[in-house]
Regions:
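N-terminal glycine-/serine-/threonine-rich phosphate-binding loop
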Residues: 2-70, 366-367, 374
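Ligand-binding beta-strand-loop-alpha-helix segment within the catalytic cores
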Residues: 21-35, 95-169
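Glycine-rich N-terminal segment of FAD-binding domains in flavoprotein oxidoreductases
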Residues: 61-94
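Glycine-rich anion-binding loop/nest that anchors nucleotide
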Residues: 171-173, 209-251, 258, 274-275, ...
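Class I SAM-dependent methyltransferase SAM-binding "motif I" and its flanking Rossmann-like core
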Residues: 181-225
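Histidine-anchored nucleotide/phosphate-binding helix
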Residues: 82-93, 390-415, 419
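ATP/nucleoside-binding phosphotransfer catalytic cores, i.e., glycine-rich phosphate-binding loops
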Residues: 2-12, 22-30, 232-328
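Metal-dependent de-N-acetylase/amidase catalytic core
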Residues: 203-211, 215-220, 312-381, 400-404, ...
Length: 663
């Protein structure tokens, strides 16, 4: 069973020579905009293997010489896969860490001595406790020391690093503001280990680990930029779409203290290691025509023309030969003969993505429509990772499908329970207890006792405590109720609303369980029952919590099994991927775009607002200050504005989709 098919989704196939050049000369040509040595790999696993190869070589060389190998290690999602690869080599007895000395790059401050949120705990969980590093060779800053001892502790940390001969390597991730370790914007290139105030943007980013900003400690004790730059080698890692913008600035931008990671440009052996998604905005990947000759696919031509339109502020049909020549696109003139021919081709391609009939228009010529006319009506399954992703990402399209008489089913893949605040549970429990008092004269002892139990739990709840199973169940019920109300508003019968409660989600923690065959079996059973003609799945694979990717993997794995089994229904089924909660599709990838009127956009907003627990006080709103309905409207309006700027029809908003073809 293939459980990672989402990782094989390639929307823009980047020629190998642009990320894995064969010679130094080729690398110099395509990377001339880059100011740090950057290695790009097709997958996270390949990138991690590269880093692990370098680390293994260094450790073994030090062992051969009878020396320590000294590492400064960061924590987080970017570096964890590297640690997994190193652990794998240890477990296969390919590598020992007995001569390794580790310095934790930063620690939160202040912390209680018994605090469970220490960064060293994360480092131990993901790496140190899984290999043979001696306990006496692990050093960390102490987040529980008295404030007056901080300066001496930081000075001692610097001295201890020097005692071991300095750092051989630093393995770091990067924050959204370009921070490395806990060095916030404004940090000096000469800065040493010190206490630093955690900035507001970093606090928002840390919500992924702490549930709310309020739980994030106010400060960190961190190795300084100057300390990290003393390492013989520095690896900076980043994976996924969400890191692509900051990595472009760090790699191709100027050195500035507002992006501390740019100081790595001064290091003689700093190496940035990215997957293709994280490298998406580098010039050689996003605009390859600016650094080399290209193999011009339809998507690359569309991307180039949209870029040109935005750069010189012209619609497609007004682009001239001169515009092409002056902006590095003369190859297209040779390919198409003239700007006019290229303009018409791309204009028509974009025009054909627009449809007001997402389920196909019955009894109409569908030659140039994104969705086929028959069969009509269609059976449709919309898979929603959380109980609100459906309306956030494609609420307008769902209403259009219902109004056009298609048989629409909503499948909510997870309970979404940990994304409900404790106050919501308290509010509902007050109501239930009051209902018991008013209409049952408090005779229902189960309700009365459960009310007291939950009230007591919340009163005594401490930092790091996990909710009880009963509380998680109540939180799940709250989200189910909201989803049902939204479906009723959108005229979807409740017997077409399916709560799948995939097992991987039910860890009760931010970090989920691995997705397994049990999850796939639940999805597959629904598909076998409905036998859909259309499937909609989340394409928001940049979701910072990872739930969207796992949910999509479960659906794609189920489809894969049905394909292997020769399921008849799949032969007449199209699969569409949506975005909207965390990102939007790039215009060169859009294959169907559904326009929304002002009234339809307002109805979409109303659908989202039915999910009251996900408004202002909800945990995990991510790094975006806007509420989900605001994000959705802004993205949908931006897509419509982009089409308008290119000279196509002007709409209030648009929802975009990309077709997935089973691998």
């Amino acid at each position: 069973m293939r459980l990672n098919l989402s990782s094989q989704i390639v929307l823009n196939k980047v020629p190998v020579e642009f990320y894995k050049p064969k010679t130094t000369v080729e690398y110099s040509e395509i990377s001339r905009m880059e100011k740090i040595h950057t290695d790009i790999f097709a997958s996270v696993s390949e990138g991690c293997s590269h880093i692990a190869d370098c680390i293994e070589k260094g450790i073994k060389a030090a062992q051969h010489e009878g020396k320590y190998y000294v590492m400064a290690l960061g924590t987080g999602l970017s570096v964890n896969p590297v640690y997994d690869e190193l652990v794998s080599r240890y477990e296969k007895k390919k590598l020992s860490f007995r001569n390794v000395v580790v310095f934790n790059a930063y620690e939160y401050y202040p912390l209680r001595k018994d605090s469970s949120i220490r960064s060293i705990n994360q480092l131990k969980e993901h790496f140190l406790d899984r290999v043979d590093i001696a306990e006496q060779n692990i050093f960390t800053l102490d987040g529980s020391i008295a404030q007056e001892a901080v300066q001496d502790t930081c000075r001692l940390y610097e001295q201890r690093i020097k005692t071991f001969g300095g750092l051989d390597v630093a393995i770091l991730g990067i924050g959204r503001m370009g921070n490395i370790a806990a060095n916030e914007p404004g940090s000096s290139i000469q800065s040493l280990t010190r206490i630093i105030l955690i900035g507001n943007m970093s606090r928002e980013e840390m919500e992924n680990s702490f549930k709310t900003k309020e739980q994030v400690p106010p400060c960190s004790l961190t190795m300084g930029v100057g300390t990290l730059l003393t390492a013989k080698t520095v690896f900076l890692t980043a994976w996924g779409d969400e890191k692509s913008e900051i990595m472009q600035k760090v790699i191709e931008g100027n050195i500035t203290d507002t992006l501390p990671a740019t100081f790595l440009q001064t290091h003689p052996d700093a190496q940035v290691v990215l997957d293709l998604s994280a490298a998406a905005h580098l010039t050689r990947i996003e605009h390859p025509w600016l650094v080399s000759s290209c193999e011009w696919t339809d998507k690359l031509v569309r991307s180039a023309l949209v870029w040109l339109c935005q750069k010189i502020n012209k619609p497609i049909l007004k682009l001239t030969n001169k515009d092409y020549n002056e902006n590095g696109l003369s190859e297209l003139l040779a390919l198409y003969g003239s700007a006019y021919n290229a303009n018409i081709k791309i204009f028509n391609d974009l025009q054909h993505t627009i449809t007001g009939w997402p389920g196909g228009k019955p009894d109409a010529d569908d030659t140039y429509r994104p969705e086929r006319a028959k069969p009509y009506p269609k059976r449709v399954v919309v898979f929603s990772p959380h109980p609100d992703d459906d309306v956030i990402s494609m609420g307008g399209t769902i209403r259009r499908l219902v109004q056009q008489h298609h048989d629409v089913h909503l499948a909510y893949e997870t309970s979404g329970n940990i994304a409900v605040g404790d106050e919501e549970v308290t509010r509902f429990m007050h109501f239930i207890n009051g209902f018991n008092q008013l209409f049952a004269e408090s005779k229902d002892s189960v309700i009365a006792n459960k009310y007291k139990e939950i009230k007591t739990f919340f009163a005594n709840k401490k930092e790091g405590d996990f909710d009880t199973r009963d509380i998680l169940t109540i939180k799940g019920l709250i989200r189910r109720g909201e989803a049902r109300i939204a479906c009723t508003y959108n005229e979807i019968p409740l017997d077409h609303v399916h709560f799948l409660d995939l097992p991987f989600y039910e860890s009760g923690k931010i970090e989920k369980l691995p997705m397994t065959e049990k999850d796939v079996a639940v999805v597959r059973q629904l598909l076998q029952e409905v036998k859909p003609h259309q499937i909609y799945v989340a394409g928001d694979l940049a979701d910072p919590h990872g739930t969207h990717r796992k949910c999509t993997d479960a659906v794609l794995a189920a489809i894969d099994l049905e394909k292997e089994a020769g399921a008849e229904w799949l032969k007449d089924c199209r699969i569409w991927m949506y975005r909207g909660a965390w990102a939007e599709w790039e215009i060169e990838n859009i294959e169907m775009c559904v326009p929304l009127s002002p009234e339809e956009l307002r109805a979409k907003r109303n659908s989202i607002l039915k999910h009251q627990s996900q408004m202002e006080s909800a945990p995990f709103l991510g790094n975006d200050d806007r509420l989900f309905w605001q994000r959705a409207e802004d993205r949908n309006r931006a897509t419509a504005q982009l089409y308008d700027n290119l000279g196509l029809a002007c709409y209030e908003a648009m929802e975009a989709f990309v077709e997935y073809k089973p691998l």
